[in-house]
């Protein structure tokens, strides 16, 4: 028995090595995280079927009490049986891939085992299929209830499944008792041990990747948080100097440089003696990035093409900084050792460049809003609030350590939110669908900060989504409700948004079940800015002024509220307002 255990452990080592190699393939790791449709499930079935087929071929043939020491089985005599590690592959596939993958792998493993022959061919084939069904549905239940499958659980489950196989042998094979006495204990021990090792290794590699992504995201967000005040000032030598110092401190690169389209704005680290701020660009790589607008990397001085002969910088990645689709500068990370420029550094640089480009657009939008004082309506449009960005960054940063996928989705919602801010700040009217996207992005971020606190229901007629509306009106009304309508301890905070057509006008209603507004304050809201601990009413005043300025007094806000009952804000606008250019002309005339 001991010899059989030792020989089977050798086979486990082969399967573990195969699993280790596969775990370092990006596609395999992605499939374990998420299967998008039947094609991905088919890929997993093929991969894990290889495990089981290898296990069948490397099984140990046993004829009576004699162990046949063959490295690769071509077939099994009708009087022999096989002790193998097939259940490892079937069990892990079901736990990680679910019912379809488990049943698929179990069926292939069972059919292949049956084709090899032997006294236990039929019983092993049936038990393989049953193993796929059982582990597949257990994996599905664990995933449904968001529970983690531990290696210990996998080992215990393997004991049960191999025991089930032994029962099948007893039921089907004529001399099953002697076979079970020979192979039961070795197969139970080795398969449970192998399942524990294989799942532990796969999960460790996946966890290592998740931790690396979380740390990388956390690093990017910290840099973004630190650099935001400077990028709001635009691409100036002073602001870029502080930004370069922050990036250099947090990334550990040998040098960091920022440029505009003509000159170096800041350079921190090695080669500062000839990469001098305010001097013209001296690397051909930077000029090429500015010309093409594409990310470029170099792993030699020749490719960097620095005009200074003694430049110690041997590798670089140069990323374009963009604003509204135009390249306005570059971010450059330099290294003195080409081996330091790995895929991790490339992804870090790409992430920073995207965030910096957004920050530059935010700064430009803020500057332009200050220059539009001659346009009264545009001056009333909502300004970008940096405090909201700080709160959102802190929320995503916290999620990076607990839920990387949710943090990624929130980053996308944050991008949508600020894109809507930027677009809205330059337009008098936008499609209702764009405004609803703005509202949804804001809600996603707020609900991430305060889980299960707010319930927002939206009732929108589909044919009205192309109607032109003033930007920010719904978003600010929903934000106003979430911030001011509810006392801290209110258990159910509900907001309803209704948009419908009636008599050629588009009607908007925003209702909440909050604490309501006192009658004295209610008379002032929307008509003036008021002083209060609960807020100044600036958002409602701005919305009201914009509606009146665009469509006339008949479209002004109507606010109804009862203390401890809730508030309802309504307004109407014409449905067929035409193109934005026509509206602008009619207003200016």
Curated annotation (Swiss-Prot):
GO terms for cellular component: plasma membrane. SUPFAM superfamilies: ATPase domain of HSP90 chaperone/DNA topoisomerase II/histidine kinase, GAF domain-like. Its EC number is 2.7.13.3. The modification Phosphohistidine is found at residue 387. InterPro entries: Bact_2-comp_sensor_kinase (IPR050640), GAF (IPR003018), GAF-like_dom_sf (IPR029016), HATPase_C_sf (IPR036890), His_kinase_dom (IPR005467), Sig_transdc_His_kin_internal (IPR010559), Sig_transdc_His_kinase_LytS_TM (IPR011620). It is found in: Cell membrane. It is an enzyme of class 2 (transferase). It holds the Pfam family 5TM-5TMR_LYT. This is Sensor protein LytS. The lineage of its organism: Bacteria, Bacillati, Bacillota, Bacilli, Bacillales. The gene is lytS.
């Amino acid at each position: 028995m001991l010899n059989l255990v030792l020989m089977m452990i050798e086979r486990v080592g082969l399967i573990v090595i195969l699993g280790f190699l596969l775990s370092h393939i990006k596609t395999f790791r992605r499939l374990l995280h998420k299967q998008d449709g039947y094609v991905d499930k088919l890929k997993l079935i093929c991969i894990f079927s290889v495990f089981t087929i290898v296990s069948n071929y490397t099984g140990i043939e046993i004829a009576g009490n004699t162990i046949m020491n063959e490295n690769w089985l071509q077939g099994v005599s009708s009087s022999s049986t096989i002790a193998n590690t097939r259940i490892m592959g079937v069990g892990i596939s079901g736990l990680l891939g679910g019912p379809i993958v488990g049943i698929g792998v179990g069926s292939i493993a069972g059919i292949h085992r049956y084709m090899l022959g032997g006294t236990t061919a039929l019983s092993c084939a049936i038990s393989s299929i049953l193993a796929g069904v059982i582990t597949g549905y257990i994996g599905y239940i664990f995933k449904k209830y968001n529970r983690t499958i531990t290696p210990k659980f996998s080992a215990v489950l393997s004991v049960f499944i191999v025991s089930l196989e032994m029962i099948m042998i007893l039921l089907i094979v004529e001399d099953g008792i002697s076979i079970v006495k020979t192979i039961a204990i070795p197969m139970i021990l080795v398969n449970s041990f192998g399942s524990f090792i294989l799942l532990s290794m796969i999960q460790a590699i996946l966890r290592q990747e998740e931790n690396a992504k979380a740390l990388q995201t956390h690093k990017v967000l910290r840099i973004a948080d630190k650099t935001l005040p400077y990028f709001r000032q635009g691409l100036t030598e002073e602001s870029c100097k502080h930004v370069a110092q922050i990036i250099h401190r947090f990334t550990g690169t040998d040098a960091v440089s920022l440029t505009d389209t003509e000159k170096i704005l800041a350079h921190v680290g090695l080669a500062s003696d000839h990469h001098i701020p305010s001097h013209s660009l001296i690397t051909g790589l930077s000029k090429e990035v500015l010309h093409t607008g594409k990310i470029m990397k170099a792993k030699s001085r020749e490719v960097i093409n620095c005009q200074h002969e003694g430049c110690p910088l041997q590798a670089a990645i140069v990323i374009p900084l963009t604003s509204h689709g135009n390249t306005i500068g570059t971010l450059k990370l330099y290294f003195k050792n080409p081996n330091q420029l790995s895929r991790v550094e490339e992804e870090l640089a790409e992430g920073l460049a995207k965030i910096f480009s957004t920050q530059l657009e935010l700064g430009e939008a803020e500057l332009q809003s200050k220059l539009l004082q001659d346009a009264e309506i545009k001056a009333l449009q909502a300004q970008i609030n940096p405090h909201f960005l700080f709160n959102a960054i802190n929320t995503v940063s916290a999620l990076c350590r607990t839920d990387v996928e949710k943090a990624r989705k929130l980053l996308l919602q944050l991008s949508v939110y600020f894109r809507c801010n930027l677009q809205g700040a330059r337009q008098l009217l936008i499609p209702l669908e764009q405004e609803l996207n703005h509202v949804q992005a804001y809600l996603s971020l707020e609900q991430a900060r305060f889980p299960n606190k707010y319930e927002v229901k939206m009732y929108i007629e589909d044919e009205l989504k192309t109607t032109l509306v003033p930007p920010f009106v719904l978003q600010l009304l929903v934000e106003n409700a979430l911030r001011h309508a509810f006392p801290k301890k209110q258990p159910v905070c509900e907001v309803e948004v209704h948009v419908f057509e009636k008599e050629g006008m588009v009607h908007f209603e925003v209702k909440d079940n909050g604490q309501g507004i006192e009658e004295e304050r209610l008379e002032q809201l929307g008509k003036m800015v008021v002083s209060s601990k609960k807020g100044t009413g600036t958002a409602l005043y701005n919305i009201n002024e914009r509606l009146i300025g665009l469509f006339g007094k008949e479209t002004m806000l109507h606010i109804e509220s009862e203390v401890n009952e809730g508030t309802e804000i309504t307004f109407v606008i014409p449905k067929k307002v035409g193109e934005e250019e026509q509206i602008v002309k009619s207003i200016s005339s």
